[in-house]
Structures are given as C-alpha cells and as structure tokens.
C-alpha cells in the first residue's frame, strides 16, 4: 500500500522477453480493467487503415460511419486499432514528429507519445522489409535498455509505433 491505494493488491508481472526490466516488475493491477483499443483520428482513414494492413498485416474487421465520419476497426496482435476520419466541428491539430534527444526519443509534448508492439520474429529482417516498402524510421534499429532490439516507425497521421524484439 505504498501508493495509498488499499483496494488494489500488489502483483508481479513476469515478462521474460523484456530483460531491460530485469525480467519482472511489481505493479498494481485492477482486474476490473482489460485493454480495449487505440483510437486514431486520421485525415485519410481508409488510406491509413490500408497502411496498417500492408505494412503490419493488420486485418480490417469493420468499416462503418460514426457521427458522419468513417470509422475503421483493425485487429493487430490481438488488439483493436480504430481509425476514424474528421467529424463536423472538430479542428484536429497536426501531431508533432518524434525527435531524438541525448539518450531517448520523444514527441516532446504532453499526451500519448507512442504505442508499442512486441515483435515475435526476426525484427531486423522485418525492419529491412519495411524499409524496402518505404517506411520511415525516426529511430533506427538499436539496442534498448537491457540489450533488447527496438526501433520506431513513423505511421500515418503522426503516429509513432515502437517495435521491440520479443
């Protein structure tokens, strides 16, 4: 109860493939929650959805109109990405590009910086395959904390995705 939250019990999460955390970490977890989706606002939602299909092998599972804008549901790695278009009354601001700092990379803005996927395969070969397709990497392949291989992909709509070797 170090953080003053008595209703949550301490749990140990074991991630043997993520050695930069020493293989495990102590965390507080609330079993009432499960992860549902990432929602991306796009100027070109169908083109963006196609990019995730062509580059990462995502599957389009639904394509609807919600509040006057396209809303496309993708499945990738057992998770849902929702890409939707501009809705009347919105004035979305462009996302900042990710940039390198001395020892890390960041969008240097409040809010979501990036999301990440563990890649269960040869990340170096997948990186090369994406390069051949013209994908941009603001952070090229490198050894992360603890020695795991990682890179950052520039996805459509200013989205940054970290790929980590599982």
Predicted regions mapped to residue ranges:
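Vicinal oxygen chelate
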Residues: 20-31, 73, 127-166
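Core segments of cupin and vicinal oxygen chelate
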Residues: 40-90
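Short, P/G- and charge-enriched loop/turn segments at secondary-structure junctions
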Residues: 99-105
């Amino acid at each position: 109860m170090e953080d003053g939250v008595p209703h949550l019990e301490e749990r140990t999460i074991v991630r043997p493939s993520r050695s930069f955390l020493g293989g495990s970490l102590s965390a507080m977890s609330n079993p009432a929650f499960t992860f549902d989706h990432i929602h991306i606002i796009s100027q070109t939602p169908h083109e963006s959805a196609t990019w995730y299909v062509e580059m990462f092998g995502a599957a389009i599972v639904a394509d609807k109109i919600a509040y006057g804008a396209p809303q496309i549901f993708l499945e990738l790695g057992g998770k849902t990405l929702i890409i939707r278009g501009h809705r009347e009354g919105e004035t979305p601001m462009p996302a900042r590009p990710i940039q390198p700092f001395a020892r890390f990379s960041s969008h240097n803005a409040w809010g979501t910086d990036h999301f990440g996927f563990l890649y269960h395969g040869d990340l170096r070969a997948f990186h090369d395959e994406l390069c051949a397709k013209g994908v941009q990497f603001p952070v090229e392949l490198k050894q992360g904390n603890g020695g795991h291989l990682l890179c950052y992909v520039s996805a459509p709509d200013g989205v940054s995705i970290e790929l980590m070797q599982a």
